[in-house]
Amino acid sequence: MKPFRFKKFTVQQHKEVFRVGTDGVLLGALADVSDAKNILEVGTGTGLVALMTAQRNPTSNITAIDVNPVAAELAAKNFLESHFGHRMRAMHCDYKTFGTQKKFDLIISNPPYFETNPSEKDATARQQRELSFKTLISKTAEILATEGRFCVIIPFPAGPTFEKTCEENKLFLLRRITVYGNANVEPKRLILEFSSNKNISVSEEIFVTEKAPRVYSEQYLKATADFHEFE
């Protein structure tokens, strides 16, 4: 597969690993990565989100894990070929059995999920997922630092259940970004950010990716300006 080139790094791709997509770019661009020294990405795939995070937070140390050995190897290669490789590492690891004494300031994930009408290839890959939302949340609650944050991008319909499960695990909603493909359609994704501290108010944001078919919105162009090579 062709590599995907960004301004400051290149992402090599592989047929057995989820390719670079809008979800990952949005998560990498919009997640609050400030003041996070130790960062964990769960389900790194190509390593895209971890690389974007490393670029945005130059003092962070990033661990990226994936249950797919091909993905972990590919991410490791992409890290080494970047300017950020000295503070990044990729591991072939199942999050359910991930052993660590470290507490993370930020745990970030673009978890696998079922689409309503996915392509056959993606449907097969997603149906082989080992990590359920419930497992993702409970494990995160164990290893998140006291003042840490947990940030994910998920399908819009999954939001209420995901938020409820987080609250049951003492992870409280801090920020909700509702993502629309364009202004005339139903919401497509949610970017959710949680902390272990119960918040008095939740930050609510709206994000629209396109102003017309295949024409990015000004909001998207601004959010990704440090990454994409737009003409």
Curated annotation (Swiss-Prot):
Give the superkingdom in one word: Bacteria
> What GO molecular functions are on record for this protein?
nucleic acid binding; tRNA (adenine-N6)-methyltransferase activity
Question: What is the name of the protein in this document?
Answer: tRNA1(Val) (adenine(37)-N6)-methyltransferase
Q: Which family does it belong to?
A: Belongs to the methyltransferase superfamily. tRNA (adenine-N(6)-)-methyltransferase family.
Its annotated compartments are:
Cytoplasm
Q: Give the species this sequence originates from.
A: Flavobacteriaceae bacterium (strain 3519-10)
Kindly report the protein's main subcellular placement as a broad class: cytoplasm
EC numbers: 2.1.1.223
